[in-house]
Every structure is written in C-alpha cells, then in structure tokens.
Amino acid sequence: MHKAGFVNIVGNPNVGKSTLMNQLVGEKISIATFKAQTTRHRIMGIVNTDDMQIVFSDTPGVLKPNYKMQEMMLHFSESALADADILLYVTDVVENPEKNVDFLEKVGKMDIPVILLINKIDESDQKKLVELVERWHSLLPKAEILPISAKNKFGTDVLMKRIQELLPESPAYFDKNQLTDKPAKFFVTEIIREKILRYYDKEIPYSVEVVVERFKEET
C-alpha cells in the first residue's frame, strides 16, 4: 500500500507557516523573516519514503488585499483550500481567533481533515493556551487542535505522525527524488530577497522584487 497527498498550510501573516514547512520537509524551502507576508508564492516541499509521498504547500498569509500583488497572494491561499487532502491551519498565541472570519468559514465547511496548529506556545503559558484551545474549538469544532512550537520543533513529530495516518492511499504525484516544484533560480531570488528584508528596514521598499538576470549552475 502506498500513500500520497497534498498537505496545504494556510493562515494569517507572521504565524510561522514557512518555519513549519521547513521543519516538516527537513530543508529550507520557504524563506522566513519578521516581516508579514514574506511568502508571496505557493511553494511545494515534498517528503518521500518508500511507501509514502507528502506534498506540503506553503502559502502567503491571508489578509484583505489592498493592491494587485496581495490579490494574487490571497488567490494562492484560497486555491490551497480547493486541492488539499489535509489542511493545516496555522495560528499563534497572540492572534485574535476572530480575525478573517470569512476565510475561517470556508475552512469550517471543508470535508477533509483540518488540523489547527497553535504555534509559538513557548511564548505563552498553560492557562492562556487552554483558553485559546477552547476559543478555536468553538470556531472550528471539526478541526483537530495541536499546540506546537515550529521554531523549537515541539509537537512537529506528533504532527507528522498524524499526517501520515490521515494521508489517503494513492500513487506518488511526483518523482521520488524531487524535493520541490520550483527551479533553483527561484530559490536564488528568494534567498536574496530574504537577506534584503532581514538586514534592511526603511532603506528599501517593503514590496521589493529581485530579478536574476543571469544564472549558471556549477557542474
């Protein structure tokens, strides 16, 4: 028996989606900074074993779009609801659960397994965490709720085991040697953009775009 499926990661900006994706895949697939909406594209990271293939998909943060690029980014997040076999909805210990109610309603109507992940629990205490679990359960009663700290790898092993249990029977969707759907040139531009956003603040526009004019891979 072989299992395979798409596990899509959604949630608001700056809750740790990209950090979680990198931890689950075991490679740095998505760049991460302290700035909201660092992720602009939908990026896949693929985990392969002999009898399993998990296709993770990181998406831009959900928010009301104010310009064309944000409209495109929201489209990526909404498309992740349409083709997921398992949905990971990521929040954190400081986020207001009532934020983006319209998007949450769409999540609540889905007929696939939804795992709600309360991230950054290392920045909270037990009492607040219990309150958050109760509030989120009232908003998404069908979702499984799992507290994690993606940065510290707390709860990620439990999450991975649960994903493997929920994964449907299916042949592999991608070659077993493939790690992502993006070419090397894409990751070069993303790494450069990550460094710009991390080390510069007001010196450059927040919506900076990196263009690599020439790229040559060493053999």
Tell me what each language-model feature is.
Residues 36-38, 60-63, 93-97, 121-124, ...:
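Conserved nucleotide-binding/hydrolysis micro-motifs of P-loop NTPases
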Residues 184-219:
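P-loop NTP-binding site
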Residues 48-51, 72-145:
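Conserved C-terminal guanine-recognition region of P-loop GTPase G domains, centered on the G4
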Residues 1-75, 79-81:
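Conserved G1/Walker A P-loop phosphate-binding module
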Residues 27, 46-50, 65, 84-87, ...:
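Conserved, well-folded catalytic cores of nucleic-acid-processing
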Residues 113, 122-184:
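Canonical P-loop GTPase G-domain recognition
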Residues 8, 22, 41, 45, ...:
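Solvent-exposed alpha-helical segments within well-ordered globular domains of core cellular machineries
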